[in-house]
């Protein structure tokens, strides 16, 4: 029986072209150094995926599209918080979208959070190898994190990509939102049922339909504002 051939692994030059075109389509300006760091991050994900169980995606080209470009798609919208905001990425896993935010927004201070120590170990490795001085890692349940103790302070932006139901996310993380800050959830299809379960004092400020280059799938970004943070 003839074995099915695996598709060839994309070269770094091919990935760089895909990244450059994708970032331009998203309106995200990246320097050569930032593009290099994002490609190095893809290489780290591909290298250590089997050890750390980071993603079901094995192909670097698909990693670039489904992880890097997907994460870059939120940068223009989060940028409204200014050039020096503090962000918390909840349920970060392999560092998404937090590592991408730390690279694309070098003036931001980004904290990655996960409950799995193995994932945190990879996050720390990525921080060291990519030399991201604006990135920090904290392990533990988000609802137990205390500003001024487990994390330096409250956050302008709290974001998640694949963490939990929207209502649960808001309930667990709302104590960490700084005045004027908000919670952002990256979702696939429009999450109307999840929005209907939002807790008291929380409401959708905006729902943005995202278009991710080379990705044929629905993507939405939901911003939730809180009474206590207004």
UniProtKB/Swiss-Prot annotation:
<comment type="similarity">
    <text>Belongs to the methyltransferase superfamily. RNA methyltransferase RsmG family.</text>
</comment>
<feature type="binding site">
    <location>
        <position position="96"/>
    </location>
    <ligand>
        <name>S-adenosyl-L-methionine</name>
    </ligand>
</feature>
<protein>
    <recommendedName>
        <fullName>Ribosomal RNA small subunit methyltransferase G</fullName>
        <ecNumber>2.1.1.170</ecNumber>
    </recommendedName>
</protein>
<dbReference type="InterPro" id="IPR003682">
    <property type="entry name" value="rRNA_ssu_MeTfrase_G"/>
</dbReference>
<keyword id="KW-0808">Transferase</keyword>
<dbReference type="GO" id="GO:0070043">
    <property type="term" value="F:rRNA (guanine-N7-)-methyltransferase activity"/>
</dbReference>
<dbReference type="GO" id="GO:0005829">
    <property type="term" value="C:cytosol"/>
</dbReference>
<comment type="function">
    <text>Specifically methylates the N7 position of guanine in position 527 of 16S rRNA.</text>
</comment>
<dbReference type="InterPro" id="IPR029063">
    <property type="entry name" value="SAM-dependent_MTases_sf"/>
</dbReference>
<keyword id="KW-0489">Methyltransferase</keyword>
<dbReference type="Pfam" id="PF02527">
    <property type="entry name" value="GidB"/>
</dbReference>
<keyword id="KW-0949">S-adenosyl-L-methionine</keyword>
<feature type="binding site">
    <location>
        <position position="161"/>
    </location>
    <ligand>
        <name>S-adenosyl-L-methionine</name>
    </ligand>
</feature>
<feature type="binding site">
    <location>
        <begin position="142"/>
        <end position="143"/>
    </location>
    <ligand>
        <name>S-adenosyl-L-methionine</name>
    </ligand>
</feature>
<keyword id="KW-0698">rRNA processing</keyword>
<keyword id="KW-0963">Cytoplasm</keyword>
<feature type="binding site">
    <location>
        <position position="91"/>
    </location>
    <ligand>
        <name>S-adenosyl-L-methionine</name>
    </ligand>
</feature>
């Amino acid at each position: 029986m003839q074995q099915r051939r695996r598709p060839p692994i994309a070269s770094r030059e091919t990935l760089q072209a895909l990244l450059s075109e994708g970032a331009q389509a998203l309106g995200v300006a990246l320097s050569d150094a930032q593009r290099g760091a994002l490609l190095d991050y893809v290489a780290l994900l591909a290298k250590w995926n089997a050890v750390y169980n980071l993603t079901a995606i094995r192909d670097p080209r698909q990693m670039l599209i489904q992880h890097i470009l997907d994460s870059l798609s939120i940068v223009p919208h989060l940028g409204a918080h200014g050039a020096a905001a503090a962000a918390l990425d909840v349920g970060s896993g392999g560092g998404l979208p937090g590592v991408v935010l730390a690279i694309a927004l070098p003036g931001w201070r980004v904290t990655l959070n996960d409950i799995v120590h193995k994932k945190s170990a990879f996050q720390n490795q990525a921080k060291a190898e990519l030399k991201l001085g604006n990135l920090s890692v904290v392990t533990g349940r988000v609802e137990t994190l205390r500003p001024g103790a487990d994390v330096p302070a409250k956050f302008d932006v709290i974001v998640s990509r694949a963490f939990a139901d929207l209502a649960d996310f808001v309930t667990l993380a709302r104590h960490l939102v700084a005045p004027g800050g908000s919670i952002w959830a990256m979702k696939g299809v429009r999450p109307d049922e999840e929005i209907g379960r939002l807790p008291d004092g929380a409401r959708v400020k905006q729902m943005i339909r995202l278009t991710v280059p080379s990705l044929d799938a629905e993507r939405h970004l939901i911003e939730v504002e809180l009474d206590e943070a207004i």
